Amino acid sequence: MIKEYIRKITEGKDLSADEMKDLFNILMEGQATDAQIGAVLIGLKMKGESVEEISSAAQIMREKAVKVPVKDRSRLIDTCGTGGDKVDTFNVSTITAFVIAGAGVKVAKHGNRSVSSKCGSADIMEALGVKIDLSPEQAAEAIDRIGLGFLFAPVYHPAMKNVIRQRREIGVRTIFNILGPLSNPAGAKYQLLGVYDKDLVEPVARVLSLLGIERAYVVHGMEGLDEVSITTDTMVAEVDGGDISVYSVKPEDFGIERASLDDIRGGDLDFNLQIALDILEGKDRSRKTDFVSLNAGFAFHAVGVVDSVKEGIELAKETIYSKKAYEILEKLREYSKGG
């Protein structure tokens, strides 16, 4: 059957929901050859994944995921993005997770090691001294007690082992970059989700709505960022239950002066680690902290703890400079030692 799906995809035809679910069951259960996996991933990429295809694949990912037994999901958010931006920024969404948690919002930070960037969220978490491969029960306890738990994708998506090597060998972004943020194992109902392509903003928002998200922002910085940008305009899709509104924002809308790309560039793991520590310790007074605060502002507004993004930015800066974000890191490090 997989050959029939490959033929259809390579002819530029969309798969139905049932076909896509069947195809992803085949991939996730290790029933496809390397050549077939490569053909499916590149074929879908060349064709362009439909909303129905993405949501069907995400449903299979969610079904097969190991669940995280968080006690209170009422205001649980994830800041996992697709990765693969074109600018090589530092780990904005990971630092943002600490800031959000520092203000008392519970975060289930889903992430992985780098696949298409220099330094993934799992890489930076590990460098910060956080144990990344906690059991589902330990991660749930970290979320409930500390306010932040890291959900290392391979622990929660064991079926992904059947495609991870092929993804790395292909070396380009595929549907799996999109599916990761759509498959939070803790069932977070709020999201700040950055995507690497402006053409994904509205489709991913529609997928989130289909998957039952309560409120989310799907964002793409127009210079190629999977974050809210402080250097140029950002395309935004705001998801509020079944309602979706798409619009553009610029840094000046929030009282933030535009930065240059050099102001927000990251580097290798050591370089990004130092940036993360400087921001979390409240030592950084550069545009990097503005960048994190802007993204945290959107996250705070998504979850409903502030009335506006601008108010969220102020809350983010207050959380950073009062060392509350760093306190979350210290608690997570301590918890990691006992975990």
Swiss-Prot record:
Gene Ontology MF terms in the entry? anthranilate phosphoribosyltransferase activity; magnesium ion binding
Task: Please give the positions of the paired cysteines in each disulfide bond.
Answer: none
Cofactor annotation remark: Binds 2 magnesium ions per monomer.
Give the pathway.
Answer: Amino-acid biosynthesis; L-tryptophan biosynthesis; L-tryptophan from chorismate: step 2/5
Listed GO CC annotations: cytosol
Which amino acids does the record list as binding Mg(2+) 1? 93, 227
Q: Name one GO biological process term.
A: L-tryptophan biosynthetic process
Chain positions recorded as anthranilate 2 binding sites: 167
- EC number(s) per entry: 2.4.2.18
Q: Where does Mg(2+) 2 bind?
A: 226-227
Q: Which residues bind anthranilate 1?
A: 81, 112
Its required cofactor(s), as named, are:
Mg(2+)
Could you say which residues bind 5-phospho-alpha-D-ribose 1-diphosphate here? 81, 84-85, 89, 91-94, 109-117, 121
Q: Which UniProt keywords apply?
A: Amino-acid biosynthesis, Aromatic amino acid biosynthesis, Glycosyltransferase, Magnesium, Metal-binding, Transferase, Tryptophan biosynthesis
Tell me the InterPro entries matching this sequence.
Anthranilate_Pribosyl_Tfrase, Glycosyl_Trfase_fam3, Glycosyl_Trfase_fam3_N_dom, Glycosyl_Trfase_fam3_N_dom_sf, Nuc_phospho_transferase
Judging by the UniProt lineage, the source's domain of life is Bacteria
- Catalysed reactions, semicolon-separated: N-(5-phospho-beta-D-ribosyl)anthranilate + diphosphate = 5-phospho-alpha-D-ribose 1-diphosphate + anthranilate
Quaternary structure annotation from Swiss-Prot or TrEMBL:
Homodimer.
- Function summary: Catalyzes the transfer of the phosphoribosyl group of 5-phosphorylribose-1-pyrophosphate (PRPP) to anthranilate to yield N-(5'-phosphoribosyl)-anthranilate (PRA).
HAMAP family listed in its UniProt record: TrpD
Family per similarity comment: Belongs to the anthranilate phosphoribosyltransferase family.
- The name this protein carries in UniProt is Anthranilate phosphoribosyltransferase
The upper taxonomy is: Bacteria, Pseudomonadati, Aquificota, Aquificia, Aquificales
